[in-house]
């Protein structure tokens, strides 16, 4: 099994593309959902965030106030690094758990939906393939204005706050161009799924695990039949 990192930009159509992959039966892990999950009350990251930033980051029900926390780390590299040092290990741990579940179920590849895949670069080394859902800037701007009922100025500000899609496209191994008709984009997704599904890149890990399991079974057989004393 291998990992596929998928990202996009605001109003690029990433969520719609993810839905198509899921309809095709693909395994998808949303890293944003994991990030929200691991900071819930009762989890280690929640306790460490409160210890590091104080009870002012808590809502009345004990949940983390994401807006307050975001304001605290805004333009504060040291605080942002501290928060990342708390959350990233827990995110990776949960991500690996979910990935292993899909491995046991026989999936050949798993898609990781990672909004900041190229910005943080922390998970890039684990990705066998990277995919960007792209659209040209004019299309992105028009979609964002229509979807969020924004002025042109506000929409442009939101787009400028992100790494440009054209830069992400240059860094990605695969680009799904969602600038035109949705039927064309959907066809690209289907073709990419077929390419990934028929790839043999999943074999090394699966063979390695099977070899390891065979070794353990063989060792247990030797222990029970030849090396351990009979009762």
Swiss-Prot record:
Belongs to the CoaE family. The keyword Nucleotide-binding applies. Transmembrane segments: none annotated. Residues 3-207 form the DPCK domain. It holds the Pfam family CoaE. It comes from the Eukaryota. This is Dephospho-CoA kinase domain-containing protein. ATP binds at residues 8-15. Keywords: ATP-binding, Nucleotide-binding. One of its GO terms (biological process) is coenzyme A biosynthetic process. SUPFAM superfamilies: P-loop containing nucleoside triphosphate hydrolases. GO terms for molecular function: ATP binding; dephospho-CoA kinase activity.
